[in-house]
Structures are given as structure tokens and as C-alpha cells.
């Protein structure tokens, strides 16, 4: 029997967090925040920003204030277009907006842009701190609420992200980033259900399409919105191949806006995988990595595809980089283990599987791969019985995990095969001892 594909290699990573645009830049229960503290609930939104602005006295912004702010925005925009963000430029941008905020405390937009500057380089602790300062002053500041939602999403707090995005939309229904964020969460729920005929799946799709249409109604050039829209239509393609045609049209619309958008290239890769065009998929995944070397999902996908091509050295490098960027990525440890196994580094492979097991003992992939490692690769004439017994133990542990029934049936067959092989080995007669070598015949004496 062959090893089930879900355990022989990690799953394709369908880009999520990297799709979400920052709201402050034109659209984009308690858990642990980016700083390790509990996440407080978002403030209650009683009035939208627009309604509050109508009810409050008109804010007068001086010419000097506007000039200082516009100058900082121009620098930010120039860096954005040049893809020039690094720790230094992010901090410089934050300092410029902070100087404007200090000089003009009433200009809350300047303080919010301090957070956006930090967020451009993934300085999430600093960005979160700034956004929280903003909503203390203005609880219905939609852009800051939206960006806090993104931070919590990126740090694995989907429920908190949804709360903040919902609040952001209540504060400002035209926030493209919050709309895309909510649609992304709905897309993830669709994937978990995996049944287009399910009523909940249909409702999630309807809501996701509404949010994405709303986002595009505000910003018709949003490559992020078109990309997520395309991913939504990729779901359910197994029962309706026409959905792939619609998905491709939406991805092409995103490409017209920004073909160098890394999540778009990753989405193209997923599309080509569904079309069984593996070489084109790999090309798209590689393009995504080139555009954004820190793009974890794209690196995972390159690693997954190259495992299939048995390019184990490339897969090893990709999964190693993912672990560097995301040390708690379970699938990356599994992928690295498979790559090292292909490179004949069995000790290294076992170490990676065990790291995955320690990371999440409830998942079964590590146990299954350890079983395969001992059964197919570590067994030899010298330690045959011990290796098979160890493999059987891992298969039995796998059977206690949550997994598809088909994979559990495969594990049961492997256990039965091990038992039969060991039993036959034990019944076999011991090998006949080799006969002692006969003495060489005497040689006649040499003639003088």
C-alpha cells in the first residue's frame, strides 16, 4: 500500500493572512496579543465615523498641519512604491508621523500612520501599541480597528480578528481591508466544511462575496480583493469545474491591477494545481517567493511541489526557511523531515518529525511518518524486528489521533502487514551455518 498523500507531504498552503491590505493605507473571548498579553474586546461602536463627524463641530486643520502631514505621507508613498521597506525606513517613517502627531495632537490620522509604518515591516508589537493609543482617543477610528484585526489574525487569533474587523466595518463600512479580512475568515470556514451543498457553506460564500463586492465598490483596483474573490470561487471546484473558469477571470483582473502582488501569484499556483498543471503551479509559487521572500505560504507550496518532483534539496531549503520565519509551523517540520528522508538523512528526518510531534501531539502526521521511517527505511537485517515493532507502535499511536478514516484504514493494513512479516520471519528456520573451509591440497615440492 502507498503512503497517504496527506502524510507523505504537507498540504498546499492557501494564502490567508498575506492577502489582507492595511486599512489605513487605502483599504486594507481573550487570547494572546502580539505582545503576549490578553486581547481586550473592541470598543462598542455606537456611531460610525461619518455620523460622528456630522454631529461634531467641523474640525479645522491648519495649513501648516496639513503640510507637515502631507509631507510625511509623500515619503511613505514613495517608499511604498519603491518596495523600500526595511527596519530602518519603517522606523524613519514612524518617527516622521510621530513628530507630526506631537506637533498637532488633534490630528489622530498622524498617530494612526505611526502604527501603519511599523506594520509595514511586521513590527506588530509597536503597531498594536500605537493603534490602541488611537482607539483610546477615538474608539470608532475604523482604520486602527481594522489593522488591529489584521495583527490578531496574523498572530493566530482569528476570533479576535473577526471582532475587530466587524467593529471596523460598523465604524466605517468603506474599509476595504476589514471587508477583505472578514471574507478571508469566511473562506477558511468554507474550506473546513468542504461541502458546497452544505447550507452553512453556501451562506459563508454569499457573505464573502458580499464583502468582496463591497470592497471592490470602494476600490475597484484592489488586487487583494480580486485575489480573495478568485480563491472563493476555487472552493467547490470538484463538483463544478466552471468555478475554476470564474476564479481565473478574477485572478486575471487582479493581475491587471498588480501582477507583482505576491499573494496573487500564490493563488495562481493553487489554480494551476487544481488544473493539474504542476509545472505552471511551481512557476507561480516561485514567483510569489521571489516577490516576497518572507511569504510563508508560498514557500510551503514550493516545498510541497518539489517534494513531488523529488527535488529534496530545494524542498529542504524551503521548509528550513519557513521554520526560520514561523518556528511553530507544524507542516514545515513534517515537510523538512520528508525532504531529509529523501536525502538519506534518517536521523535528521526523525528529529524533525519528533519536533512536530512535540509541537502538537494531537495531530497524526508525525506519528505516521515516524512509522513509515522505521518500517521502510530504518529496518535492516540486523535490527529488522526492533524497527518493525517501533513502526507498529507509531501506527498504533496514530490510530488514536483524529484523522480521516481512509488513512486509519491504511495504518491498520500497515500494522497487519508488519505482524504477518514478523510472524513469518520468526517461523522461518535459522539459516544453515556455512561449511568450514576445506584445507588446501598439499603442493608437490618444488623441483630443484
Q: Each predicted region: which residue ranges?
A:
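N-terminal leader/linker segments that initiate helical-solenoid repeat arrays
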Residues: 25-104, 108-109, 426, 445
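Long, contiguous interaction/recruitment modules in multidomain scaffold/adaptor proteins
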Residues: 25-66, 166, 177-188, 194, ...
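Helix-start (N-cap) detector for alpha-helical repeat units in TPR-like alpha-solenoids
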Residues: 65, 108-109, 142-143, 176-177, ...
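Structural signature of tandem alpha-helical TPR/SEL1-like repeats
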Residues: 84-95, 120-133, 155-167, 189-214, ...
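Structural marker of alpha-solenoid helical repeat scaffolds
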Residues: 103, 137, 171, 218, ...
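Terminal, low-structured helical/coil segments at or just beyond the last alpha-helical repeat
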Residues: 376-380, 385-448
Amino acid at each position: 500500500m502507498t503512503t497517504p498523500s496527506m502524510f507523505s507531504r504537507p498540504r498546499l498552503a492557501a494564502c490567508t493572512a498575506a492577502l489582507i491590505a492595511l486599512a489605513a493605507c487605502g483599504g486594507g473571548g481573550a487570547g494572546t496579543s502580539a505582545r503576549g498579553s490578553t486581547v481586550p474586546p473592541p470598543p462598542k461602536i455606537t456611531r460610525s465615523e461619518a455620523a460622528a463627524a456630522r454631529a461634531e463641530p467641523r474640525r479645522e486643520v491648519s495649513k501648516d498641519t496639513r503640510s507637515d502631514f502631507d509631507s510625511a505621507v509623500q515619503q511613505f508613498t514613495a517608499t511604498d512604491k519603491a518596495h523600500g521597506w526595511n527596519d530602518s525606513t519603517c522606523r524613519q517613517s514612524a518617527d516622521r508621523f510621530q513628530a507630526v502627531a506631537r506637533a498637532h495632537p488633534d490630528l489622530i490620522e498622524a498617530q494612526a500612520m505611526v502604527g501603519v509604518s511599523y506594520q509595514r515591516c511586521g513590527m506588530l508589537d509597536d503597531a498594536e501599541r500605537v493603534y490602541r493609543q488611537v482607539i483610546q482617543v477615538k474608539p470608532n477610528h475604523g482604520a486602527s480597528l481594522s489593522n488591529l484585526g489584521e495583527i490578531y489574525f496574523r498572530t493566530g487569533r482569528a476570533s479576535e480578528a473577526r471582532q475587530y474587523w466587524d467593529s471596523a466595518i460598523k465604524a466605517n463600512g468603506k474599509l476595504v481591508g476589514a471587508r477583505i479580512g472578514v471574507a478571508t475568515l469566511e473562506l477558511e470556514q468554507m474550506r473546513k466544511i468542504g461541502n458546497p451543498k452544505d447550507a452553512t457553506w453556501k451562506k459563508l460564500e454569499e457573505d464573502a462575496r458580499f464583502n468582496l463586492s463591497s470592497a471592490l465598490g470602494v476600490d475597484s483596483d484592489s488586487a487583494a480583493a480580486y485575489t480573495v474573490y478568485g480563491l472563493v470561487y476555487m472552493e467547490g471546484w470538484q463538483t463544478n469545474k466552471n468555478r475554476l473558469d470564474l476564479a481565473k477571470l478574477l485572478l486575471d483582473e487582479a493581475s491587471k491591477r498588480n501582477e507583482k502582488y505576491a499573494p496573487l501569484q500564490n493563488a495562481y499556483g493553487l489554480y494551476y494545481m487544481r488544473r493539474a498543471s504542476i509545472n505552471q503551479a511551481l512557476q507561480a509559487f516561485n514567483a510569489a517567493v521571489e516577490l516576497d521572500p518572507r511569504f510563508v505560504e508560498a514557500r510551503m507550496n514550493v516545498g510541497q511541489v518539489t517534494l513531488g518532483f523529488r527535488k529534496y534539496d530545494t524542498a529542504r531549503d524551503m521548509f528550513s526557511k519557513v521554520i526560520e520565519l514561523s518556528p511553530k509551523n507544524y507542516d514545515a517540520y513534517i515537510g523538512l523531515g520528508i525532504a531529509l528522508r529523501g536525502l538519506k538523512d534518517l536521523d535528521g528526518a526523525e528529529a524533525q518529525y519528533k519536533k512536530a510531534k512535540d509541537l502538537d501531539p494531537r495531530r497524526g502526521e508525525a506519528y505516521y511518518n515516524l512509522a513509515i521511517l522505521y518500517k521502510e527505511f530504518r529496518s535492516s537485517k540486523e535490527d529488522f524486528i526492533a524497527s518493525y515493532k517501533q513502526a507498529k507502535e507509531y501506527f498504533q499511536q496514530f490510530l488514536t489521533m483524529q484523522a480521516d478514516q481512509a488513512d486509519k484504514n491504511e495504518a491498520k493494513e500497515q500494522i497487519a502487514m508488519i505482524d504477518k512479516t514478523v510472524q513469518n520471519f520468526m517461523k522461518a528456520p535459522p539459516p544453515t551455518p556455512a561449511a568450514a573451509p576445506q584445507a588446501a591440497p598439499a603442493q608437490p615440492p618444488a623441483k630443484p
